[in-house]
Amino acid sequence: MSQGHGKYDFYIGLGLAMSSSIFIGGSFILKKKGLLRLARKGSTRAGQGGHAYLKEWLWWAGLLSMGAGEVANFAAYAFAPATLVTPLGALSVLVSAILSSYFLNERLNLHGKIGCLLSILGSTVMVIHAPKEEEIETLNEMSHKLGDPGFVVFATLVVIVSLILIFVVGPRHGQTNILVYITICSVIGAVSVSCAKGLGIAIKELFAGKPVLQHPLTWILLLSLIVCVSTQINYLNRALDIFNTSIVTPIYYVFFTTSVITCSAILFKEWQDMPVDDVIGTLSGFFTIIVGIFLLHAFKDVSFSLSSLPVSFRKDEKAVNGSLSSMYEVLNNNEESLTCGIEQHTAENISRRNGNLTAF
């Protein structure tokens, strides 16, 4: 792959990844509104295993929006490294957070806005330092990578962990612990990204006139992708139905991105030939995104905005002045009471003495 062609593919993948984030961020809002409408109608909720959302057009609109985003995301993996494409999902967090504040009445405070800004800055840093060229260009190379012992161990662990979460942990703690369903989506999502990457390579070879449809790996990747995406949709719906959208979206991003970067490092070894400064820059960008996501999530219930900064200061100042005034009044009252008591006591003693003298 020539350097010019590699950069051209890089920017195509970048544009597709950004458009994907916009579609996916909007899909969370549409699907959540559909689920809320069903809840008001008294239908069995998705978090309780219900599937009434299949009759709700808003949910289908959200699904189509997510589908468009996933198609763009799928295409992006064919042109750019997973280390670049996946972290740009932070834009979907930004889109979802802003739209949820307008359409779902989920407030976005100052901490959330700073978190969104940090997510964008972190994504920018990752784009700058991400690897610009792909090293896998054929299905045969992909097949060789999938047979690597490191990836086989990773895939086996993903399957085991997913089965335990789905059949053991999920029924017990899925309704109360947000991490259960999101972890299922994330670890399975790492495998789906690998499948999407392989299918993207297959499609590029198909347009080049190669007989990829006769390659067994093409159909294995397609079947695996369908199973993984179906599972992701199911458990993501449950998480969205039970928990706040502004919580689900950022946590899902962090878990999903971490899983994909780990899978990409094991399978594609994209980090192997990266300079040290690019590795440090990529990790710094990713941790910056995590800090932004934390601010967006941890302080979501705090009613705090930029305009409230001087107001709160004035309130504190008034409170201090008020407490000092109250203390001063109490001291004055006590002093007056003490003075009155002494005077009254003195008067009584004088009157008693006068009475005694009169008796004599």
Curated annotation (Swiss-Prot):
Segment forming the signal sequence: none
Membrane topology: Multi-pass membrane protein
Cytoplasmic face residues: 31-56, 100-107, 171-175, 237-246, 300-360
One GO CC term on file: membrane
Chief subcellular location: membrane
Superkingdom of source: Eukaryota
Record field: catalytic activity: Mg(2+)(in) = Mg(2+)(out)
Gene Ontology biological process terms in this record: magnesium ion transport
Cross-referenced Pfam families: Mg_trans_NIPA (PF05653)
GO-annotated molecular function: magnesium ion transmembrane transporter activity
Segments on the Extracellular side according to the record's topology features: 1-9, 78, 129-149, 197-215, 268-278
Transmembrane spans: 10-30, 57-77, 79-99, 108-128, 150-170, 176-196, 216-236, 247-267, 279-299
Keywords: Cell membrane, Endosome, Ion transport, Magnesium, Membrane, Transmembrane, Transmembrane helix, Transport
Subcellular location per the Swiss-Prot or TrEMBL entry: Cell membrane; Early endosome
InterPro entries: Mg_trans_NIPA
Described purpose of this protein according to its UniProt entry: Acts as a selective Mg(2+) transporter.
The family this protein is said to belong to: Belongs to the NIPA family.
Protein name: Magnesium transporter NIPA2
Organism: Bos taurus
Lineage of source species: Eukaryota, Metazoa, Chordata, Craniata, Vertebrata
